[in-house]
């Protein structure tokens, strides 16, 4: 984002108001610029489960500016020396380490917590990564081997220019900073915890892909660990829910306001899993992941949670906030719900038998299959020498990981039966240009 520093200063000035709001900081402990593990945090400012019994670590008043220091989504296991083999079996019990909860004074159950994003900066190590983990991601049946892209993150904007992430693993690619919190939310109340547990457990029992409560490596261990009183109801942070959480909505950038229903007094705001940038869909399961420093303003809209449907919302009155996320140049593929005969996708098994599905090459009204088709076509486009807009054609795994940070899956229609359309838009401005205006590497 151009002039990001100026925008941050403007947002800070607006947020502070004429009387200057108090500024609050929730710190974490770092060793040589890298955060210590969530479970080892001596300040007690980290947790990796949702439960209203998790105690607030800081208080803030309405209108305060609050800075959260955060870990990355996997609790910082990867670094510049990490190999693909090191990515093969990460500990998913550690996901996501969150900073908080923050108790907002004057906020009560039934209110709406308004959280305005003021600033998102990478942590002091200026390192990010994108990974493909076996068994996880949208195309986990196609990409079965581990992979990693290591990113160097521009520490400062120079002369108002755009800040980029670059990688030796993707030569000729630079991804601009559009930072946001992939996971941001409030604590659920006990009734909401029980409702979420029951519906997810019901889904798990019919072979849905669900991660149930897991006390191993849960933080705080005293509440959620193997001997904790809430070990069977401390919910995992991977699925988004009524409280927000791991929504991975890339539009939650500077100048937007997130609206969360408060399910407990004080709301219990937590932030983590921050991204330098992400494509709509986050198809590999990761964006450009980083530890970060996030500043927000907290306000309350009294007694509006029920009117807002007890569900999160996102809004902005800052002109051009979405336009800044759109590419100047793009190429897009279009997908419909088609597949090779013999391939059966797991979600369809809930509605049809394998005998019905196996011979089909077309399925009806299936947005997921259409998205898969569009993504596979984009990967083919990026890897085919005659069509690839990249400086050099990418390998298939390079293309998959690039799509996770720079391609936007968009639903184009859900009416033209049987073939709904999903389009996949690639931001061509992620490819560096040479002095003659061509992509680097062009003849």
Language-model region placement:
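Conserved mixed alpha/beta catalytic, RNA-binding, or beta-rich assembly cores of soluble enzyme
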Residues: 205, 211-364
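Intrinsically disordered, low-complexity linker/loop segments enriched in Gly/Pro
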Residues: 119-253, 259
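Short, Lys/Arg- and Gly-enriched loop/turn segments at beta-strand edges
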Residues: 73-85, 120-131, 266-276, 412-415
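Sec/Tat signal peptide C-region and signal peptidase I cleavage site
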Residues: 17-21
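N-terminal, Lys/Arg-enriched amphipathic/low-complexity engagement segments
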Residues: 23-90
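Short, structured beta-strand/loop micro-motifs enriched in basic residues and often containing a Trp
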Residues: 41-51, 91-99, 235-243
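A generic structural signal for residues embedded in beta-strands
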Residues: 68, 112-115, 260
């Amino acid at each position: 984002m151009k002039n990001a520093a100026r925008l941050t200063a403007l947002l800070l000035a607006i947020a502070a108001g004429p009387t200057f709001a108090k500024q609050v900081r929730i710190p974490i402990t770092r060793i040589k610029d890298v955060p210590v593990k969530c479970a080892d945090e001596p300040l007690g400012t980290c947790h990796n489960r949702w439960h209203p019994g998790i105690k607030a670590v800081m208080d803030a008043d309405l209108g305060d500016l609050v800075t959260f220091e955060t870990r990355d989504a996997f609790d910082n296991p990867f670094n510049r020396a990490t190999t693909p083999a090191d990515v093969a079996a990460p500990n998913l019990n550690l996901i996501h380490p969150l900073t908080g909860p923050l108790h907002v004074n004057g906020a009560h159950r039934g209110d709406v917590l308004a959280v305005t994003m003021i600033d998102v900066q990478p942590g002091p190590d200026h390192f990010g990564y994108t990974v493909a983990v076996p068994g996880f991601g949208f195309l986990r049946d196609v990409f079965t081997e581990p992979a990693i892209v290591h990113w160097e993150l521009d520490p400062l904007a120079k002369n108002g220019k755009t800040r980029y992430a670059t990688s030796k693993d993707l030569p000729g690619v630079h991804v601009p900073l559009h930072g946001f919190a992939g996971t941001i939310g409030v604590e659920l109340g006990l009734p909401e915890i029980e409702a979420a547990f029951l519906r997810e457990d019901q889904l798990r029992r019919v072979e849905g892909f669900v991660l149930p409560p897991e006390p191993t490596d849960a933080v705080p261990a005293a509440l959620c660990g193997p001997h904790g009183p809430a070990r069977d109801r401390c919910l995992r942070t991977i699925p988004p829910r009524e409280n927000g959480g791991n929504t991975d909505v890339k539009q939650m950038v500077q100048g937007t306001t997130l609206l969360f229903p408060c399910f407990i007094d004080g709301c219990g705001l937590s932030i983590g899993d921050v991204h330098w940038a992400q494509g709509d869909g986050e198809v590999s399961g990761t964006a450009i992941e980083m530890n970060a420093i996030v500043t927000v303003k907290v306000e309350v809209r009294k007694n509006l949670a029920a009117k807002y449907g007890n569900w999160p919302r996102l809004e902005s009155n800052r002109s051009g906030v979405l336009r800044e996320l759109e590419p100047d140049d793009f190429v897009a593929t279009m997908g419909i719900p088609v597949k090779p005969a013999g391939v059966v996708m797991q979600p369809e098994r809930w509605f049809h038998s394998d005998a019905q599905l196996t011979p089909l090459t077309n399925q009806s009204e299936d947005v997921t299959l259409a998205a898969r088709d569009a993504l596979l076509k984009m990967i083919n486009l990026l890897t085919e020498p005659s069509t690839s807009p990249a400086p050099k054609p990418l390998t298939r795994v390079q293309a998959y990981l690039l799509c996770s940070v720079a391609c936007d899956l968009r639903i184009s229609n859900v009416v033209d039966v049987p073939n709904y359309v999903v389009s996949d838009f690639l931001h061509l401005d992620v490819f560096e240009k040479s002095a003659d205006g061509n992509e680097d590497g062009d003849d």
